[in-house]
Amino acid sequence: MSNEKIIEMIKEMSVLELNDLVKAIEEEFGVTAAAPVAVAGAAGGEGAAAEKTEFDVELVSAGSSKIKVVKAVKEATGLGLKDAKDLVDNAPKVVKEAVSKDEAEELKAKLEEAGATVEVK
């Protein structure tokens, strides 16, 4: 029996007959026709197994080259000089939130090049 013939037979069935067919297939093969339900994992727990798409870049410390780090933060965030300096002075602080992995890695590299200690979370 070809797939086309099976499909034609299914087209001719009523809703009740289709429901019975689905139940029979589920019992025969030990499967379910229910759609899989996505369950959100607990924060910081089981959700870590799923690949993250958004990352936070956190400045842990400015290191010895504070002026270079302030300039790098100012350039990366668009903050004014005073705001960038305040962020660096109050480390550990999140520099950018919810950015792509590529953007997070790029920012981390720039800040580390300036002498900062950075974490991507």
UniProtKB/Swiss-Prot annotation:
Example of a GO cellular component annotation carried by this entry: cytosolic large ribosomal subunit
GO molecular function annotations of the record: mRNA binding; structural constituent of ribosome
Keyword Ribonucleoprotein recorded: yes
Keyword Glycoprotein attributed: no
Keyword annotations from UniProtKB, A to Z: Ribonucleoprotein, Ribosomal protein
CDD domains in alphabetical order: Ribosomal_L7_L12
GO biological process: translation
InterPro entries per the UniProt record, alphabetical: Ribosomal_bL12 (IPR000206), Ribosomal_bL12_C (IPR013823), Ribosomal_bL12_C/ClpS-like (IPR014719), Ribosomal_bL12_oligo (IPR008932), Ribosomal_bL12_oligo_N_sf (IPR036235)
Function text: Forms part of the ribosomal stalk which helps the ribosome interact with GTP-bound translation factors. Is thus essential for accurate translation.
Name of the molecule in the record: Large ribosomal subunit protein bL12
Organism listed in the record: Macrococcus caseolyticus (strain JCSC5402)
Gene: rplL
